[in-house]
């Protein structure tokens, strides 16, 4: 029996130079921060993150390594292909310095752009003989190269690979010696060593690390199965044979790499690591220069444009408060040299306005007088209590975040302007990291484990959107599985591990990164799913960590709707003069503080308007009863986790009610220092800025410390960094300044609420303006407003069907889509009877499902030349094929030419396709008597309307069901309005909205709609758990409950639910679910 190999004395130094994270999607089984933490715990000298043709995880690794005090090396792994495109060899490239990092990023970019999204293609010639603009990448200067031999390779193949790599990379080449504890380790070691000696390429120990811990091996297998789209049982040799791709301790490394040769290859890892001296902190970002006219400086040009804007905003006499704020802001901007950043955003906004594209800055930018004068934001900082430190801070030393919303249907014009101005080599969209959530992890893990697909879908459907980690086994048990079985427990455990894992990179909703030089030397660029779109490999959090400029070009549907409304009104006789517009009607021409508008808002008649249309907002409106613009600012912000978790909502409402009733003495302040901060909100903190100001005035925080508090509030859920701030506030405010502990505790809870989702005052102010404008238009111009909403879909909280119902409740007549009258968009038409009031809305051809825009345009053009005389005339002159005609017939849009939809469909079937009209057959057509088909019933018409239009103008579905519902003793929404508080009631309606706010402690709010209106239903958690299927899946919901009404706040508290969906038959309906 052989004696055991003695363990070495002392632990060797080691640097891991071949390590992938879960940013090698569906391959790596650990997060970057987990790998860093394990490398630091094992005492590694350095760690190289070498994800596959990617640096997407490097910023996370960089931040973790800085915190851990571990040296991080930036690198990447590649499969290099031969001239025929076949995989030939694998290697790792490591950046030695900033030039090497730039070369690495360009190499990754070249490979990624040469392949479809999610793939890459790197040819041997791309490294050995790149041409043109990439000639400087020949041999990848300033990068170390490590050849990765296959396991137990053919010596001849490895020799050829090593000789080629030696020729390309010279002395910067090493050869990896990886020992995965498999059957041929000794032979593998010998082959690699022999080729190393033959080619004079030194060996280096590397680990081929794919996980930080051996416990991740089951997850690694699942990822392999997902990547290969097959169950684990069918993956065979594609699975890693053991857990040896986990990080090894230095004791294990000493055991695997024994003897002098072993010690040498371990030392080589540290020597190579010492040659890499690059950190992401060295990245020097340079702002674009062309925004500054030739001959001017950035500071001088910004000052000139700001003062010109101030003159437009305020006239010749700029208020002293505004002038002082401008001076302060401009001085700080100059000190931090951020002028090009502001000018870049200004340039984009100026382009949009030149094209009559509505836009508006949002967020903390509304704290800035500079942004207001440049026209980036529309909230006058003089009208509120702005906190500039929230927007720009000296201590933060990073560009501020300026988000600009543009019309969602015209944002593409702005995007193309940016591409055209700066070029595709200097600008790209930020990435959005798509990660696994519960349901996607549930499905993918289930398939990997070989669980029946039907069972997977049943469990997935039972899993509600709000369910977390603890509910899975219970839901599986409800579907007939044993929740304690090893399979279900394994399923649940792997779902938990996979949740939050990166799945792939997508494109950010609108965050552009723009550079002065080649962007691809800062960060790799790859193809996005959309044509002509490119994304960088970092997301917005990565960019913020590295202080890189991101210009957010966001899309907002309400801006589209408002602009379309104003355009429609502008075309109506007398409307421009009515609003006092000298030329084109714009938002600024609408009157402020309109009484009728606020009356409508207080009645919660806000379906379709911006921000205050949700169930929670509608419930709050009759209680808060906004009467001024600033009331709307509070309204927008108060239905958020910050004020709710801080317990600030009810105290504010109570004080507001008392003041309204003539009792202002109820407004008290917790201390004299904070009175000025809280006066505008009746002594109750509502906004994030107020928390920051209280910290400064009563907690001893400096402005920069308050800004750190803001950042930690935003990151609390991820990092939990609020404890230190909360402890400091408690100590300073309670112990030193003797504030009421209950007030400070509530303030601390509010900080955590802002981490969930809270509006700063500046953000709420911008959104409140749009809420007011959209409310005014709904109140006074409902026809134009609802037509614009229909033309702006998809957007908003409510479906087109609900918007049409609301338009009718607003006394607007809606006419059906018809080829003899409809344009592509919905349009306004004067009432034919000459009566005054609102014009009619004629639904556009764009509402017809399956209708192609080009066909719709041809119909409109042909009709302008002469009216259509028949379906055949329509088909001929508008060049419509059978598909076009069939969708028009199904939508009843041929009614004027052919009669009801059955008759119309019959006629379209009789027509020949364009180009198939044979003269001989046409002359031989038999003479037939016209076939008259029976008209559909009203119920059939409604079902067909919903199938082709998503709505019906003929009847509400519940009107048809009303006799049956009455026999079941369900009453209408209109009848419920007369019920007394506490009365038992039954209601039935189509589910239109489900909401489960995180602050509602498990309560779900449901809206159901019948032919007379909507009913708001409250579902308590106990009922939800008892009747999950009805809550989640019912489309037609019967509710037994208790009616509650207080002033204008009315809802039905459910006690029992009935799923009546089968009564709808083939009617297509869907709800919009929010959480």
UniProtKB/Swiss-Prot annotation:
Organism field: Ralstonia nicotianae (strain ATCC BAA-1114 / GMI1000)
Assigned protein family: Belongs to the DNA polymerase type-C family. DnaE2 subfamily.
Name of one Pfam family that matches: PHP
Organism lineage string: Bacteria, Pseudomonadati, Pseudomonadota, Betaproteobacteria, Burkholderiales
Region forming the signal peptide: none
Gene symbol of the encoding locus: dnaE2
Top-level taxon of origin: Bacteria
Record carries keyword Nucleotidyltransferase: yes
Enzyme Commission (EC) number: 2.7.7.7
Location(s), subcellular: Cytoplasm
Any one GO molecular function term: 3'-5' exonuclease activity
Name of protein: Error-prone DNA polymerase
Role according to the record: DNA polymerase involved in damage-induced mutagenesis and translesion synthesis (TLS). It is not the major replicative DNA polymerase.
Keywords: Cytoplasm, DNA damage, DNA repair, DNA replication, DNA-directed DNA polymerase, Nucleotidyltransferase, Plasmid, Transferase
Any one Gene Ontology BP term: DNA replication
Catalytic activity: DNA(n) + a 2'-deoxyribonucleoside 5'-triphosphate = DNA(n+1) + diphosphate
Any one GO CC term of the record: cytoplasm
């Amino acid at each position: 029996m052989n004696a055991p190999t003695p363990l070495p004395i002392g632990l060797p130094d080691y640097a891991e130079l071949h390590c992938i994270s879960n940013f090698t999607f569906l391959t790596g089984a650990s997060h970057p921060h987990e790998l860093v933490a394990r490398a630091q715990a094992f005492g590694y000298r350095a760690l190289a993150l070498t994800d596959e043709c990617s640096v997407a995880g490097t910023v996370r690794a960089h931040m973790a390594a800085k915190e851990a005090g571990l040296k991080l090396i930036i690198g990447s792994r590649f499969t290099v292909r031969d001239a025929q495109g076949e995989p030939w060899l694998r290697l790792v490239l490591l950046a030695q310095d900033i030039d090497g990092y730039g070369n690495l990023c360009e190499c990754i970019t070249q490979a990624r752009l040469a392949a479809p999204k999610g793939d890459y293609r790197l040819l041997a010639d791309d490294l050995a003989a790149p041409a043109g603009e990439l000639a400087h990448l020949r041999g990848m200067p300033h990068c170390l190269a490590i050849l990765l031999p296959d396991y137990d390779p053919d010596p001849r193949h490895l020799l050829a690979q090593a000789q080629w790599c030696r020729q390309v990379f010279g002395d910067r080449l090493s050869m990896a010696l990886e020992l995965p504890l498999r059957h041929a380790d000794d032979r593998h070691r010998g082959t690699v060593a022999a080729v190393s000696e033959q080619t004079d390429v030194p060996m280096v120990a590397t680990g081929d690390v794919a996980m930080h811990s051996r416990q991740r091996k089951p997850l690694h297998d699942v990822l392999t199965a997902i990547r290969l789209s097959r169950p684990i049982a069918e993956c065979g040799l594609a699975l890693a044979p053991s857990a040896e791709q986990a990080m090894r301790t230095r004791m294990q490394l000493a055991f695997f790499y024994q003897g002098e040769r072993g010690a040498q290859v371990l030392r080589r890892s540290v020597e190579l690591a010492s040659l890499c001296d690059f950190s992401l902190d060295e990245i020097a970002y340079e702002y674009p220069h062309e925004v500054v006219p030739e001959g001017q400086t950035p500071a001088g040009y910004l000052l000139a444009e700001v003062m010109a804007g101030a003159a437009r905003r305020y006239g010749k006499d700029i208020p002293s408060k505004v002038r002082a704020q401008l001076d302060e802001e401009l001085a700080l901007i100059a000190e931090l040299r951020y002028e090009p950043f502001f000018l870049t955003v200004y340039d984009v906004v100026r382009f949009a306005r030149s094209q009559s594209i509505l836009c508006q800055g949002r967020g903390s930018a509304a704290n800035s007088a500079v942004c207001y004068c440049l026209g980036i934001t529309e909230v006058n900082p003089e009208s509120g209590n702005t906190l500039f430190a929230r927007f720009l801070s000296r201590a933060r030393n990073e560009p501020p975040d300026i988000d600009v919303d543009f019309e969602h249907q015209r944002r593409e014009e702005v995007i193309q302007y940016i591409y055209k101005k700066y070029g595709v080599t200097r600008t790209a969209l930020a990435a959005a990291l798509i990660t696994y959530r519960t349901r996607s992890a549930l499905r993918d893990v289930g398939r990997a484990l070989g669980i029946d697909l039907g069972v997977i879908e049943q469990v997935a459907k039972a899993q509600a959107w709000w369910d977390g980690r603890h509910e899975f086994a219970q839901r599986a048990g409800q579907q007939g599985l044993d929740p304690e079985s090893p399979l279900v427990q394994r399923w649940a455990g792997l779902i938990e591990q996979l949740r939050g894992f990166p799945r792939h990179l997508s494109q950010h909703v609108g965050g552009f990164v723009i550079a002065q030089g080649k962007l691809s030397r800062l960060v790799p660029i790859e193809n996005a799913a959309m044509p002509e779109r490119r994304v960088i490999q970092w997301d917005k959090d990565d960019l913020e960590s590295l202080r890189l400029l991101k210009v957010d070009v966001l899309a907002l549907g309400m801006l589209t709707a408002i602009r379309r409304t104003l355009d429609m009104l502008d075309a109506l006789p007398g409307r421009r003069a009515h609003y006092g517009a000298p030329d084109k009607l714009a938002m600024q021409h609408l009157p402020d503080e309109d009484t009728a508008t606020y009356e409508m808002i207080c009645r919660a008649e806000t379906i379709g308007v911006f921000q205050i249309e949700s169930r929670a907002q509608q419930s709050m409106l009759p209680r808060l009863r906004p009467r001024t613009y600033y009331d709307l600012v509070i309204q927008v912000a108060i239905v958020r986790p910050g004020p709710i978790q801080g317990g600030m909502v009810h105290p504010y409402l109570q004080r507001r009610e008392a003041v309204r009733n003539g009792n202002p003495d109820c407004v008290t302040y917790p201390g004299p220092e904070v009175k000025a901060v809280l006066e505008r909100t009746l002594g109750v903190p509502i906004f994030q800025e107020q928390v920051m100001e209280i910290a400064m005035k009563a907690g001893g925080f400096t402005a920069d410390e308050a800004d750190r508090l803001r950042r930690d509030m935003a990151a609390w859920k991820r990092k939990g960094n609020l404890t230190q701030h909360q402890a400091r506030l408690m100590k300073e405010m309670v112990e030193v300044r003797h504030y009421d502990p209950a007030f400070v505790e509530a303030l601390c809870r509010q900080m955590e609420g802002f981490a969930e989702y809270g509006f700063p005052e500046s953000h709420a102010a911008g959104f409140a303006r749009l809420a007011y404008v959209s409310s005014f238009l709904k109140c006074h111009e409902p026809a134009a407003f609802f037509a614009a909403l229909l033309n702006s879909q998809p957007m908003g909280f409510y479906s087109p069907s609900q918007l049409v119902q609301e338009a009718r409740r607003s006394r607007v007549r809606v006419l059906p889509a018809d080829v003899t009258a409809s344009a592509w968009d919905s349009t306004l038409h004067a009432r034919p009877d000459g009566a005054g009031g609102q014009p009619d809305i004629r639904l556009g051809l764009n509402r017809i499902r399956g209708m192609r825009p080009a066909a719709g345009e041809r119909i409109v053009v042909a009709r302008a030349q002469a009216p259509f005389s028949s379906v055949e005339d329509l088909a001929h002159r508008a060049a419509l094929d059978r598909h076009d005609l069939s969708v028009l017939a199904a939508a009843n849009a041929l009614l004027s030419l052919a009669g009801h939809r059955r008759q119309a469909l019959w006629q379209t079937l009789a027509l020949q396709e364009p180009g198939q009209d044979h003269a001989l057959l046409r002359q031989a057509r038999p003479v037939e008597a016209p076939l008259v088909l029976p008209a559909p019933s009203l119920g059939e018409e409604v079902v067909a309307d919903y199938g082709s239009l998503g709505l019906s103008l003929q009847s509400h579905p519940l009107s048809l069901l009303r006799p049956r519902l009455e026999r079941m003793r369900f009453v209408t929404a209109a009848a419920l309005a007369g019920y007394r508080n506490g009365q038992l009631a039954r209601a039935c309606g189509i589910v239109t909205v489900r909401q489960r706010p995180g602050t509602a402690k498990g309560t779900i709010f449901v809206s159901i709609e019948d032919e007379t209106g909507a009913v708001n239903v409250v579902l308590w958690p106990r009922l939800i758990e008892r009747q999950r299927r009805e809550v989640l899946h019912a489309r037609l919901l019967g509710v037994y409950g208790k009616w509650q009404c207080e002033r204008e706040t009315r809802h039905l508290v459910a006690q029992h639910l009935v799923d009546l969906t089968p009564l709808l038959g083939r009617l297509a309906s869907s709800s919009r679910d929010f959480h």
